[in-house]
A protein has these predicted regions:
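Formylglycine-dependent
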Residues: 1-85, 92-101, 121, 261-263, ...
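Active-site rim elements
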Residues: 57-64, 117-121, 161, 180-191, ...
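A long, amphipathic alpha-helix that forms part
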Residues: 71-78, 105-147
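Beta-strand elements within well-structured catalytic alpha/beta cores of enzymes
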Residues: 85-91, 120, 124-127, 131, ...
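Loop/turn elements at helix/coil->beta-strand transitions in domains of secreted/extracellular proteins
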Residues: 5-8, 81-88, 143-149, 170-171, ...
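Histidine-centered active-site microenvironments of extracellular/periplasmic hydrolases
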Residues: 2-6, 98-101, 112, 129, ...
Length: 336
């Protein structure tokens, strides 16, 4: 919808694909294989990468580092849109290990580098370098003061996205725009990713079509300083397991199908570390809190087990590790 109000849009994304484009002459490196049937070697994303730019295969060399190319493409896009509003979406391929194992080095260690022998710390530090380049690109284009920058992550640490605990959806979320966003530093306010869409719509001036339901709440009043509060609670689910969190209380791992229908209940207090939460799962005094949190869960989506297709998929969990549901309905084909 941002295009309808004059915005140009750009996506710079690193995909992990098993196949190079049909008819291509890619002669770069390949990673290993993922651990699933009929897996093939994956074209490299880091050193000597396979990069598709506007539908065309780029020619790369052993000295080319994929993340540098992706960031450079976005900086070039910024230069070409100094006089036009734009929305740029940049899902980095950092921080990820290689298909089949191994972590790449970065240009900090010299070029050409290696697709093995690096460290997660090195990749995180290189994210900082790339973000700095993007901010310098905005500054050079005279757009730093009025460009809203959102920095976040798709999920928590390795493996946690497959569990309905706080560790899955808990990620950094930083919003910056010197000429518009009120500087607050770290805050205890809650938000969830469904809030991003209405936030971008409001900032861009785009309108939501009549009858279009939104789950998220715009962050604009909070980000601009019109209010100091945003959300009372957030919720998340993976397959049949759910969680809900307020500032103080956390009910997680509620899974009546494959786990514990009661879940785990914590008093988080003012703590920021999970190790400092107080487990009150079996406390009679906590029953009113539990009831309130369970009501929130019941008013939010999860797989509709009365649907035969959904039930059959759930019953196959012991052989199929990844399941995809949208609004309680099984997504039979996943494009990414």
């Amino acid at each position: 919808y941002s295009k309808n109000v004059g915005f140009d849009e750009q996506c710079v994304r690193a995909l992990t694909l098993q196949d190079v484009p049909e008819g291509s002459t890619f002669t770069g490196k390949f990673e290993g294989k993922y651990n699933f049937p009929d897996a093939k070697p994956v074209p490299a994303r880091y050193w000597h990468p396979c990069v598709i730019r506007n539908g065309e295969l780029m020619e790369t060399t052993a000295e080319d580092f994929g993340p540098d190319l992706y960031a450079g493409f976005l900086i070039d896009f910024i230069k070409r849109h100094e006089d036009q509003p734009f929305l740029a979406y940049y899902p980095m391929n950092l921080v990820h290990d290689m298909a089949g194992g191994g972590i790449p080095t970065t240009p900090v260690n010299g070029t050409p580098g290696s697709n093995k022998g690096g460290s997660l710390q090195g990749l995180v530090e290189y994210i900082d370098i790339l973000v700095g380049r993007l901010m310098d690109g905005l500054e050079a284009a005279g757009l730093r003061e009025n460009t809203i920058v959102i920095f976040t992550c798709d999920n928590g640490e390795n493996g946690k996205k497959m569990h309905a605990s706080e560790d899955g959806p808990r990620v950094p979320f930083i919003v910056n725009c010197p000429g518009l966003i009120q500087q607050r530093g770290a805050t205890d306010e809650l938000m969830e990713f469904s809030d991003i869409y209405p936030t971008l719509m409001e900032f861009s001036g785009a309108s939501v079509p009549d009858g279009y339901a939104l789950d998220g709440q715009s962050l604009v009043p909070f980000l601009t300083g019109a209010t100091d509060i945003h959300r009372e609670w957030i919720t998340s689910y993976i397959a049949t397991a759910r969680m809900v969190r307020t500032k103080r209380w956390l009910l997680e791992a509620v899974d009546p199908v494959y786990g514990d229908s009661e879940g785990r209940l914590f008093d988080c207090g003012d703590a920021h570390l999970r190790s400092d939460y107080k487990d009150i799962t079996g406390s009679p005094e906590a029953l009113p809190i539990r009831k309130k949190l369970e009501e929130l869960l019941e008013n939010n989506p999860w797989p509709d087990l009365s649907d035969p297709d959904v039930a059959a998929e759930v019953n196959s969990y012991d052989t199929m590790p990844y399941k995809h549901f949208v609004n309680g309905q099984l997504v039979k084909e996943q494009n990414d």
